[in-house]
Amino acid sequence: MNKILPVIVGFGGYNSSGRSSFHQGFKRTVIDSLTEVDRTNTIVSLACLMGLVSWKDKAYVDVSGNILNKRVIVEKYERKVLSGTLIREIEHFDSRRVPGHKKIEFPSKKNLAFKMSKRDLPQSIPSAWEVKTLSDTEVQVTTNGSTEFLVSSSYELTSKAAGQLPTGFNPKDFYTSRFHPRGLQMAILGVNDAIKSIGISWDKLSMHVSPNEIGVYSSSVFGQVNEEAFGGLFKARLRGERTTSKQVPLALNSMPADFINAYVLGNIGHTEATTGACASFLYTVNSALRDIQSGKCRLAVVGNSEAPITPEMSEGLSSMSALVTEDGLRRIDGVEKVDWRLASRPFGENCGFTLAEASQYIVLMDDRLALELGTVIYGGFPGTFINADGIKKSISAPGPGNFLCFSRAVSSALNLVGNDVIKKNSFVHAHGSSTPANRVTESDVLDRTAQ
């Protein structure tokens, strides 16, 4: 019996470089190496994504309705397209003036008296307060003992860069997204992009398999941390606001899969959400491969969607000394003014990584189904390799897992295509860490493989 090979027949999604399908995002990343024609097409495509121009009545038009050709679009919008993509200073909020509160304490020796609206009194009156009614609507409060107040203030983030979706591209504008957290909005658009990249409608694809042979494998390791979910839930009472009935369910890390099943595919087959820090995409792929290779699944939608660019997530990771900081970049670059475009430096002289948001999906089939349907095959998955790090003093420190899983992957490739192909006709496409400790071990793994 021949072993089933899971193959990639479609891919799509969105990140800071733009749309993934048909390599738009990749072309933006390597734009300085493109031919003039490819560069022009990439700029025009991104200008459309960013809402600078649109395709209407078989012509490109700007927001004022003026008809433009590709050359004019490049001349007019190239700088804006390039500066509004990839890693850049945070645009979602003002990272230099993040709203917050300053705790102020009045010592017990000094009583404090103030007037306030009666309706603004807390439900549970502090024990140190004496409340005197002045009218039907006003009271006077006198404090006896130490009293604390939270006063509206602002603070500055130490890390001010992120990999954000292109400026002007707002997922919520493309469908009815009321109450949906940003990460779920991105999941809806990302999976649609992947499915449409196949070139065969989902209705036609699903006719060739039974419902139980379709699987959706998707998750979000952080869950949803925006105001519509955990972000709003955890801050509501501290801000004097109420929680909503949607914040808890929409925050769950399985929601990307649930949204895809319910709002995109109408899937009644298998569904699964697996997470594992920055390896979550690998974990979802591993789950899909397991089911395809066993014959349980023949058509799978696989991916993840994350939208963690919030002040709280930035602060939390900065407190771990994980994120690149302004002071850190000044130190290693020897400059006063930091270029946030250069904040992420995998395998280079760096001082941390950057936050990013992205929605990335692939569509997998078993090789027999792909050949039957005549789909384009972009690649295959002979296997996935995952190893834990064993005992170590710090959970975020490097461990032997990198060496073990990578050596297993290379060994699998050697068995599949032979030593000569690996030496002369292969390359390693690596995700590089921007943390000083991990970059050393990851570089070591790649060096050993090259040798």
Residue positions per predicted region:
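Structural signature of cysteine-dependent C-C bond-forming condensing enzymes
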Residues: M1, G199-G215, G232-S245, A262-H270, ...
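ACP-dependent fatty acid/polyketide chain-elongation machinery
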Residues: M1-D173, R368-G380
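Condensing-enzyme catalytic core mediating Claisen C-C bond formation in acyl metabolism
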Residues: N2-S16, H23, K27-I31, G328-V421, ...
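Conserved catalytic cysteine-centered active-site region
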Residues: I43-L49, I90, E138-Q185, G223-S287, ...
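Short, well-ordered amphipathic alpha-helical segments that serve as non-catalytic structural scaffolds
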Residues: M186-G199, S254-A257, T284, D366, ...
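Active-site-proximal alpha-helical scaffold in enzymes
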Residues: M186-I200, N253, A257, T271-E306, ...
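Conserved small-residue
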Residues: V191, V216, F281, A288, ...
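Acyl-CoA/ACP chain-elongation machinery
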Residues: K296-C351, T384-P398, G432-R439, Q451
